[in-house]
């Protein structure tokens, strides 16, 4: 059991990826920064994640704390498959007191032998093992949490197991739960085109790990159903997923359970992302001494082989080049803008070949006006945020939108489609009031996008107004400390929900799905 005070809130944060041990997408960054912010606030938060074969044990030496943890697979007696999968649990040797404890679930077949975090045909088994392994770990009583914080479809199984298979377990049944949805990906099976025979209503018992039925049971859906509280990574996205357009086939379920659905915008590490101290950029600056920012623009122009023209508006795209990010809209627009206006344009990121080919040709046609780096890079984004005037983010949908937060921090003004987290993080500039941190548009059309860009470029001509927008952008507070406070509120709501649901006659609102 924890050595901390009995009154200390104890959280087990379960995630398929956690930076710096395993990092594929934004989830790993949330799993890194949010627990650290909560730890500073006095929460006893610990993490539970697979021990993948890619984790460098020289860099992160581990010690075993549980040997041969038996995780049930629920396989039928007549099956030749194992009834249990044997795992170990490890922790980092000599961890820093400023960092949360991380428990690594070790299994040779499903984690250790795999070179990637995702992308396997048996991912449903792998994350079923993670989910049930976490519950078996808790029963060893090395750490018994008050709440389990689950993330994305990989851990939806855990919430289902907890409320069905372990519903009468005296140690587990009182534990409250929060399910954070970072995106609506639902695993390898295509649930949106499932036949009537394959439809999963979410109420049946989870099948054996090795059965075809388990593959077709929707972990994300079940996590939503069985969690005490559900949140997405922005308030606006929480509203959007109630609609057919954004709900990925789950909009009716979200509407049914909207009473327990919340949105919290992700944060940004203001110590790491700090233009005053950032060693990556050419010249440090702040919202007060913005004149130093100009050196970064010249540096960016040199880096991308552009003409050195500090007075020309420099527009940028940074991130994954795919349809979700609105690349089709950029392609429909950018050629016209470059031919008609005196602007420069840089593109950074890897992605779909059709987009890469387009930007390669664009750079050839507009030599000196267009620069590209068409592969992922972890250094250049900072240089773009510090040197570009405008970042283009015309996403089709965007649950969180961390690129906008990074750009705002460095005074690179976003032009965004007002969707998901982008609508929550960027304030459309109002010229009459002089208030705003960027430029927004709603309809996903070329015309609306061009209007937003035109508004920004016209405003750019008025240097005093543009500097005011930059200052307002840089002074926004999206720190993880603020985010952590909001998660604490959700933890309290989840705890209240669990206590009420355990009453002999729970309120009708709590009898939603689980009976």
Residue positions per predicted region:
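Catalytic cores of nucleotide-sugar-dependent glycosyltransferases that transfer UDP/GDP/TDP-activated
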Residues: 1-515
């Amino acid at each position: 059991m924890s050595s901390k005070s009995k009154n200390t809130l104890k959280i087990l944060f379960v995630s398929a990826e956690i930076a710096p041990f395993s990092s594929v997408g934004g989830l790993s960054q949330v799993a890194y920064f949010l627990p650290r912010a909560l730890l500073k606030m006095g929460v006893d938060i610990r993490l539970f994640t697979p021990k993948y074969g890619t984790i460098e044990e020289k860099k992160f030496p581990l010690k075993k704390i549980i040997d041969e943890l038996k995780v049930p697979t629920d396989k039928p007696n007549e099956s030749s498959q194992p009834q249990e999968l044997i795992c170990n649990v490890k922790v980092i040797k000599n961890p820093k007191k400023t960092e949360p404890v991380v428990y690594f679930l070790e299994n040779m077949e499903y984690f250790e032998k795999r070179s990637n975090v995702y992308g396997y045909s048996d991912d449903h088994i792998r994350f079923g093992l993670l989910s049930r392994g976490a519950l078996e770990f808790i029963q060893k009583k090395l750490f018994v949490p008050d709440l389990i914080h689950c993330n994305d479809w990989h851990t939806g199984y855990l919430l289902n197991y907890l409320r069905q298979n372990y519903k009468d377990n005296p140690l587990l049944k009182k534990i409250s739960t929060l399910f954070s949805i970072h995106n609506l990906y639902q695993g390898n099976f295509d649930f949106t085109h499932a036949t009537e025979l394959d439809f999963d209503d979410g109420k049946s018992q989870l099948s054996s790990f090795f059965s075809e039925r388990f593959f077709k049971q929707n972990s994300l859906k079940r996590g939503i159903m069985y969690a005490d509280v559900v949140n997405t990574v922005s308030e606006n996205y929480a509203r959007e997923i109630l609609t057919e357009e954004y709900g990925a086939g789950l909009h009716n379920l979200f509407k049914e359970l909207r009473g327990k659905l919340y949105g919290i915008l992700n944060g940004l590490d203001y110590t790491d992302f700090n233009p005053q101290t950032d060693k990556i950029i050419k010249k440090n600056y702040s919202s007060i001494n913005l004149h130093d920012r100009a050196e970064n623009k010249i540096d960016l122009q040199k880096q991308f082989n552009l003409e050195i023209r500090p007075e020309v508006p420099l527009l940028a795209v940074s991130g994954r080049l795919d349809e979700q990010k609105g690349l089709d809209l950029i392609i429909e627009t950018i050629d016209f803008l470059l031919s008609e206006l005196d602007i420069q344009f840089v593109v950074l990121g890897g992605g779909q070949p059709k987009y890469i080919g387009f930007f390669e040709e664009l750079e050839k046609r507009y030599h000196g006006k267009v620069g590209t780096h068409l592969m992922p890079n972890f250094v250049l984004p900072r240089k773009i945020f510090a040197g570009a005037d405008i970042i283009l983010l015309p996403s089709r949908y965007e649950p969180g939108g961390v690129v906008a937060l990074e750009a705002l921090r460095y005074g690179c003004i976003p032009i965004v489609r007002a969707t998901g987290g982008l609508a929550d993080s960027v304030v459309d500039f109002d010229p009459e009031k002089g208030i705003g941190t960027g430029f927004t548009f709603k309809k996903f059309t070329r015309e609306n996008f061009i209007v937003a860009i035109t508004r920004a470029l016209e405003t750019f001509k008025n240097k005093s107004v543009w500097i005011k927008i930059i200052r307002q952008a840089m002074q926004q507070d999206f720190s993880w400390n603020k985010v952590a406070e909001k998660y604490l509120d959700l933890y309290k709501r989840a705890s209240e929900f669990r206590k009420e649901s355990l009453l002999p006659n729970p309120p009708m609102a709590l009898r939603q799905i689980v009976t």
